[in-house]
Amino acid sequence: MEPLSAPLAVGFSAWPPSPPLPPLAHSPLQDAVHADHNHRRILNSCRNLPDCLTTTVPQLHQINSAEQSPLQFTHQPNCDLIVVLDEQTTYTTTMTRRSLPKADRYLSEPNMSTPQASHGSFEFDVPEYTSFDYAFDFPPVPEAFPPAANSSSAASPDADFLDLDSLMSCDITSLDAYIHDDSIASPSNASHISPPASDIDPVDEFFPQLVHNNKIQSSSSSTVETTITRGRKTSSVSSDSSSDYRHKRDKNNLASQKSRQKRQAKIRESKEERERLEKRKVQLQAMVLTLETQVEDYKRLVMMFVKR
């Protein structure tokens, strides 16, 4: 099959024809698939197991770089490879022709029959245009140790219950005997009860927190009493200071009263002086009028004497 020439130009002459494409020296790796003997070694290693290997491989085409160009390469369909290593582990995967040599090389190793190697995983050189779907059917591995969080969460309620049991299992026989004692509870014998030999009060023995609270209350009451006495002392001091204040205030009131009286007297005197001055003014004005009339009279008399 000869390589195709360039298409004819539309609307132009087809002569001279275009030169053919130059052949390639080597075909690309993704275009050529070379058969090797790895498949035989896989089959030979698995002959003892019944139906251990089931594979469907497409027909391999020997591609000559001088006969076919990369423009004429058609992508071959993928192959399905199912390898049964033992009765419990089965690998099912889909791979391309480029990943077959690595898978064959991995399966042909002698340690693949061991249980430690049966849990491995394939590593393939995946091109960008190829997608794989892996489906591994592994038996569930039992957990040797449960998670720490679950154990702690499960143990916490048990610890709480143990704490409650330890609290509820305390010995209260002495308290019960003390409460139900008739000699202590009867009012007739209450006055004849002698103080206990030990310094520890039964209430202190059974309810130490209550006694502690009572001590706190008694100390608080004593502090209140001391503050009251201090308040009384301060009140006496304040009474002395208030008497001094009242004495000074009385003095100030008397002084202000005297100053008010003096001011009122001055106001009265000024009023009287004003009235007096006003009267004097009126008198002086009347005198001025009389004097003016007299001057007029004297002038007329003088004029009469002069005319004669």
Curated annotation (Swiss-Prot):
Q: Which CDD domains match?
A: bZIP_BmCbz-like
Induction section of the entry: Induced by P.aeruginosa infection. Induced by translational inhibitors such as cycloheximide and exogenous or P.aeruginosa-derived ToxA.
Q: Which UniProt keywords apply?
A: DNA-binding, Immunity, Innate immunity, Nucleus, Transcription, Transcription regulation
Highest taxon listed in the record's lineage: Eukaryota
A GO BP term, please? positive regulation of gene expression
Q: Major location, coarse class? A: nucleus
Compartmental location: Nucleus
User: Which region ranges are annotated with the description Disordered?
Assistant: 217-277
Its function, per the record, reads: Transcription factor that binds to the promoter and the enhancer regions of target genes. May act together with the bZIP transcription factor, cebp-2. Involved in responding to mitochondrial damage. Plays a role in the delay of age-associated mitochondrial fragmentation and muscle decline. Has a protective role in response to infection by the Gram-negative bacterium P.aeruginosa. Required to prevent P.aeruginosa ToxA-mediated lethality.
Question: What's the protein name?
Answer: Transcription factor zip-2
Q: Which organism is it from?
A: Caenorhabditis elegans
